[in-house]
């Protein structure tokens, strides 16, 4: 690409969501309510898992990390979106844009790896119940968590450094956050290296974890079908239903947007799809896990009863 129109960009302008000005206050209240719901819902899961000893198991260890990731993932974009909806100049500093991109990639990738760990945990619990505590040892759980955090950190740093070396011809981003693909379209510099890394790392970070999840559940189904029973089928749905719902929500939108892009995709359509996995999915996850999970509902009742006894004393 030519660099004749290259300018020094100190800030970017985020065009935000395609909302009619007359409806801006209504959508602001809606998004604020969704963000508060996301924060409170995920915090509730984290607190319940910490307070209730019955939930001190590998599955809920991964779930608490997933809730923390959802909380942070939503917080990367939502506060700035809400601020810009009330601002006449919806801008973000250059350094702030790169920082937002880094944490967006970090927590988005972390969720992908945590979903894999949770799928493996369900696979071991159903297919090897007698050896579950031996296989899912504290050492293995800790190793899976550390590996997830380290790999996502490396991936986010790599893309951020590659983006920081680029020069930009314009500073108007047709999005509500600093999306990597939107930033590349504004670059004057050669972006071939960035695009190659996105293609390769996209396969490693998204496709491989997704295939591992599918493989885990394929083996679970295969194991159940070998000894078909109503109890076995109910066990699969009760223990895996919530996780499969979250996997479908997350990967359905991400793969549809980034790995299966359509030439007919408009900016508005891409923005709406991005809202699905950055705002809607983190908000729905606590409801999916709490409403369909007897352990979580039981933990909530025990904590409430414990507080009532404390206050009565």
From Swiss-Prot:
Glycans are attached at residue 5. Residues 1-25, 80-100, 159-195, 260-271 are extracellular. One of its GO terms (cellular component) is plasma membrane. It holds the Pfam family 7tm_4. GO terms for biological process: signal transduction. Keywords: Cell membrane, G-protein coupled receptor, Glycoprotein, Membrane, Olfaction, Receptor, Sensory transduction, Transducer, Transmembrane, Transmembrane helix. It is a multi-pass membrane protein. Coiled coil: none annotated. The chain crosses the membrane at residues 26-49, 58-79, 101-120, 140-158, 196-218, 236-259, 272-291. It is found in: Cell membrane. The keyword Transport does not apply. Residues 50-57, 121-139, 219-235, 292-313 are cytoplasmic. CDD domains: 7tmA_OR1_7-like. GO terms for molecular function: G protein-coupled receptor activity; olfactory receptor activity. PANTHER family: OLFACTORY RECEPTOR (PTHR48001). Belongs to the G-protein coupled receptor 1 family. Putative odorant or sperm cell receptor. This is Olfactory receptor-like protein DTMT. It comes from Canis lupus familiaris (Dog).
